[in-house]
Structure formats: C-alpha cells, structure tokens
Regions:
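Catalytic core of bacterial c-di-GMP phosphodiesterases, primarily the EAL and HD-GYP domains
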Residues: 7-8, 38-113
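Active-site core of bacterial EAL-family cyclic-dinucleotide phosphodiesterase domains
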Residues: 1-32, 69, 101, 129
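Short, contiguous acidic/charged loop-to-helix segments that flank catalytic cores in large enzymes
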Residues: 33-37, 41, 75, 158-164
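Conserved acetyl-CoA-binding loop-helix of GNAT-fold acetyltransferases
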Residues: 42-45, 165-171
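Cyclic nucleotide signaling catalytic output domains
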Residues: 4, 28, 32, 49, ...
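Conserved long alpha-helical elements within nucleotide-processing catalytic cores of c-di-GMP signaling
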Residues: 27-31, 40, 118, 166
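The catalytic core of metal-dependent phosphodiesterases that act on cyclic dinucleotides
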Residues: 87-160, 173-182
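Residues at alpha-helix caps and immediate loop-helix transition turns in enzyme cores, especially N-
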Residues: 25, 79-81, 112-113, 138, ...
Length: 182
C-alpha cells in the first residue's frame, strides 16, 4: 500500500523455465498442460508451492493474504473444490487469508458455479474478480455471483492523470464500497 508502505496481499504467479535462462510464458505453459491433460495437476502443484511460500511470509506479516488464479472449469469441479478446501485447512491457513481469483473474461454464467462459490465461502476462502471492467458484463457478474474482492484491470489505473479515468475509478470504488467489497 502506498499510504503506509506495507504489503497486505500477495498473488501467486506461474513462472516456468526448463534448462534455459529464458522462462516460458504462463499462457504457453497452461496451453501445453491442457493439451497433455496435466492442467489440474499443474494447478495443484502451483497452489501447494504458493501456500508453502506464503506460510514462510506469514512469519514476517501475520495479516498477509494470498490469492491464486484458478480457471473457472476447475472451480466447477467438485473434486477440485474439495481438494482446495482441504489443502487450505491442512496448511492451517486462517479463514479469509486465502482467495481464488477468477478473471472477468471467464465464462461463468452457469448455474453450478454459485454452488461452488458458496462451498468456498463457507470454508473461509475469498473469491476475487480479477481484471474488473475489461469486459462488457462486469456489473452483471457482480449482481449474480458472490465476490469478496474486486481487482481493477491495470489498464484503468495507468492513466490516473486523465480526469475521466480518475472519475471512473472513483465510481468503481464507490460501487465496491456499496456492495461491501474490499
């Protein structure tokens, strides 16, 4: 946070290199993992490593939060959701210290997703809408689904010198406050 120079939340990001100095870009790794039917196991490895690293960070900052991007297909998979809930419990992550991020461009207008969101909420796992306002249905998503946090898309905040951009951001912040988002 710029105001007090404190870190409040961290996000796990995929970085992968294999026998080279140059890392492979995350979208390429994800594409290959999906093609080889390894996407779910890869996601689990990423989450386990992120939680392991997060537990080390908690020694310095007990109030820290961790979020991980998870594709909606996995969050609509009962076995995966149960695994996620269990790993968070096993690692003794406090309720509301762990969250899943779903990008706004995810196609999540299906009836089942709300049930899985509810399971996550009931087990103290936060749900973030990532990249808010890039798509045309942002507001509808907020109306129909349970989110704890909204993360604005970076393209909104890069032009803060523009008065209209600033007003748009302020409006989104006011909307978030009205809907009790962090």
């Amino acid at each position: 946070c710029i105001k007090d120079n404190k870190i409040y939340s961290v996000e796990a990001l995929l970085r992968f290199s294999y026998h080279t100095q140059t890392p492979l870009y995350a979208p390429m790794v994800i594409y290959i993992a999906k093609e080889k039917d390894l996407f779910e196991p890869l996601t689990k490895v990423i989450i386990k490593q992120a939680i392991k690293d997060f537990n080390k960070m908690l020694r310095e900052n007990k109030d820290l939060k961790l979020s991980v991007n998870i594709e909606l297909d996995l969050l609509c998979n009962e076995n995966f959701v149960n695994w996620l809930v269990n790993i968070v419990k096993e690692e003794r992550i406090k309720p509301k210290q762990f969250g899943v991020e779903i990008t706004e461009n995810s196609k999540f207008f299906n009836k089942g997703v709300s049930n899985y969101f509810e399971i996550l909420h009931n087990n103290g796992i936060n749900i973030y809408m990532d990249d808010f306002s890039m798509g045309h249905t942002s507001i509808i998503y907020l109306q129909d689904h349970l989110f704890d946090y909204v993360k604005m898309d970076g393209s909104l905040v890069v032009n803060l010198d523009n008065p209209r951009s600033k007003e748009i951001i302020n409006s989104i912040i006011k909307l978030g406050e009205t809907l009790n988002f962090d």
